[in-house]
């Protein structure tokens, strides 16, 4: 398995962050705990929003979809990683690796685009409150979400198809927790210039443009908030954006730690940074969006109260 060219029938070895059995046991329980917290947190957000008519608004519509994306994202990577940590067989098939890569790339892009749309929603709510209902109509919300999905699916498809033309030689040991694009490209022994060029071009379109849009939106939002004469209204306006700003900072901060570096400098140490955006960010989002949100507190309280009453 260590020599020759990559074929569809061959495999990769996902070695994870450590090959020490003792450390692997610790990592297993740590990632299992994080996975369960992520699943429970995001499922509760989705159920609370879908079951409470008071939360059937654009901002919560996009939040529910962000939670669904995060739920799908961790399920794409962590279960396989947990199996590998408990098993002596750490192999993942070529097809399995490409499938994992496709969903990973697509869902990161989708997360990014939904955060950009949520920034636009906050901009309209703060800067144009009188036009909010018409500017963020249900039809437009569905259209924006559909556009996010289409662009993300195409983005993932482009990079996965390009990866199929890459040849891998020598060791196929991946010192990572999942099949990550930069790691696979580093293992290639064929020309990856096209992959690299397309990665930069599509990355600018899918990530940099939405990120710039988020920055501009928040500059305008902060300007609008500073013009509000009442201190209490200023605080209320800022608090409605604080959770989204926290999620944006966590997402882009962890993403920059991994991807804002030359391809040839990618190292095993980057696996820790990858865990931040692949595991920690989806786990933290439910806490960020519900911690200081009274509407979400109320919806979660009513949801849990209703289910506890059914049990008693």
From Swiss-Prot:
Keywords recorded for this protein, A-Z: Cell membrane, Chemotaxis, Disulfide bond, Fertilization, G-protein coupled receptor, Glycoprotein, Membrane, Olfaction, Receptor, Sensory transduction, Transducer, Transmembrane, Transmembrane helix
Pfam families: 7tm_4 (PF13853)
InterPro entries named among the record's database cross-references: GPCR_Rhodpsn, GPCR_Rhodpsn_7TM, Olfact_rcpt
Membrane topology qualifier: Multi-pass membrane protein
The family this protein is said to belong to: Belongs to the G-protein coupled receptor 1 family.
Signal peptide: none
Sample GO molecular function, one term: identical protein binding
Tissue distribution: Expressed in testis. Expressed in spermatozoa (at protein level). Expressed in olfactory epithelium.
Gene3D superfamilies: Rhodopsin 7-helix transmembrane proteins (1.20.1070.10)
Effect seen on changing residue 232 to A: Abolishes nuclear translocation of ARRB2
Disulfide bonds: 97-189
Organism expressing this protein natively: Homo sapiens
Subcellular location: Cell membrane
Segments on the Cytoplasmic face: 50-57, 121-139, 220-236, 292-312
Function field: Odorant receptor which may be involved in sperm chemotaxis. Bourgeonal is a strong chemoattractant for sperm in vitro and is shown to be a strong agonist for OR1D2 in vitro. May also function in olfactory reception.
Protein name, UniProt field: Olfactory receptor 1D2
Extracellular face of the membrane: 1-25, 80-100, 159-196, 260-271
């Amino acid at each position: 398995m260590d020599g020759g060219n990559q074929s569809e029938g061959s495999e990769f070895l996902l070695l994870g962050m450590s090959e020490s059995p003792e450390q692997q046991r610790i990592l297993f329980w740590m990632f299992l705990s994080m996975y369960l917290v992520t699943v429970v947190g995001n499922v509760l957000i989705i159920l609370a929003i879908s079951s409470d008519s008071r939360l059937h608004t654009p901002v919560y519509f996009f939040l529910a979809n962000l939670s669904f994306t995060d739920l799908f994202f961790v399920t794409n990577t962590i279960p396989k990683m947990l199996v590998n940590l408990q098993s002596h067989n750490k192999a993942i098939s070529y097809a399995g690796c490409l499938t994992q890569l496709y969903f990973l790339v697509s869902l990161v892009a989708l997360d990014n685009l939904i955060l950009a749309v949520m920034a636009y929603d906050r901009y309209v709510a703060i800067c144009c409150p009188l036009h909010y209902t018409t500017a963020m109509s249900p039809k437009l919300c569905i259209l924006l979400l559909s556009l996010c999905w289409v662009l993300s699916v195409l983005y993932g498809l482009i990079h996965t198809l390009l990866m199929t033309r890459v040849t891998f030689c020598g060791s196929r040991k991946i010192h990572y927790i999942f099949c990550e694009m930069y790691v696979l490209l580093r293992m290639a022994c064929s020309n990856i210039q096209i992959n690299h060029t397309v990665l930069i071009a599509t990355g600018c379109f899918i990530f940099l443009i939405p990120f710039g849009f988020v920055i501009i939106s928040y500059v305008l939002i902060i300007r609008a908030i500073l013009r509000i004469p009442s201190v209490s209204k200023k605080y209320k306006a800022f608090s409605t954006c604080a959770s989204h700003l926290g999620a944006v900072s966590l997402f882009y901060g962890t993403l920059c730690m991994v991807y804002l570096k030359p391809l040839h400098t990618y190292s095993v140490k980057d696996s820790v940074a990858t865990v931040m955006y692949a595991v920690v960010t989806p786990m933290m989002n439910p806490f960020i969006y519900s911690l200081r949100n009274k509407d979400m507190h109320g919806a979660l309280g009513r949801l849990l109260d209703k289910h506890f009453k059914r049990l008693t």
